[in-house]
Amino acid sequence: MLFTRIPQQYAPLGGELRYAVSQEAAGNIDIRIVDAAAGPAEGIGATASPDGANGAGTAGQTGDGSALLGAKRFAAVTEAGFDIAPYLRRRVQFVPATGGTGFHPAAGRTVTVHVEAAATGEAVEAVSPARTFRPGAEAAEAPCLLTSMPLRRLIPEGACDELTLLTDGPCTVTVTAMAGDAAAAESYRAAEAGLHIFRLDLRDFPDAETLTVDAGTCGTVVYTVIPARQEAVRLAWRSRAGSVEHYSFPVLQTEVVRSVRQQAYGPDGRTAATAETDRETVLVSAYEGRQVLEALAELTSAPEVWIARGDTYTPVDIASDEAVVQRHGTLSCLEIAVRPKRKTRTSWN
């Protein structure tokens, strides 16, 4: 039994992750998708060929149940092709990084797996090389910066931002803060290749007017610091690029409270038994170029969105179903409606 097709390292979970396995004689092929972080089952072994296909492994039992992420069976075949992405997407969990400027763990944002192949009821015959897959909808080649926002950005005083780097080796990020004619630089290093989260906290650079974040071959992001507005709301969201993006909406246009009461009617008239309250806030962006508005439009389909206040990220829901990203002959801003993840329920009787 032989693996004839294996996805590339750090392929995106938003697309297909197709494997293929073949055997000489027709028969059943059992496929098991195993969490590599849980460790291979004892007795399983395999050697990857130079082109990424995998030779037969030594006899052994399949991985334990705690490591099993999914399974498939193909009946009476010599070849089997399958997509494992649907089994893995639910394993990715995004939590925005918190803390000071520097690299932070990307825990939960990638999934590393082996795929095992065996005849039904038999020992494992082939094991694919371990592959790490990342969130996102499009392929990217390291080294690169995973983002849907432009590389020149505005950021309010005291705010934070997050950069997602895909590296092919050690990476050094240098942050240069400019204040008038004075410049100060700090360097941060990640020793290993892979997916890295770099957080920029402007509280570490209180007097900066501009900041340049130079990640070497991954790319450079330039920030212009603007005054913070008291009524501004900073949103963070999981983007199609597989990153967490941030943007401060300077205008809070409306805030509406809606309540639905459940009532009973008795001798004394109507009596409120319970009430459900929902609060919806409409935010308006600054007048932005097309690239920023396209990135903000992802909010309408983002699987996870938060309101960012310092190191506190509060999950919210997006109530808007559409976003206008261009109007002929005029600059455009974008309106987005947000609401709490849960309604407030009150019982009176």
Regions flagged by a language model, labelled:
Residues M1-A228:
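Preference for solvent-exposed, low-hydrophobicity sequence contexts
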Residues L2-A20, E24, A56, R153-D168, ...:
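Extracellular/virion structural assembly segments
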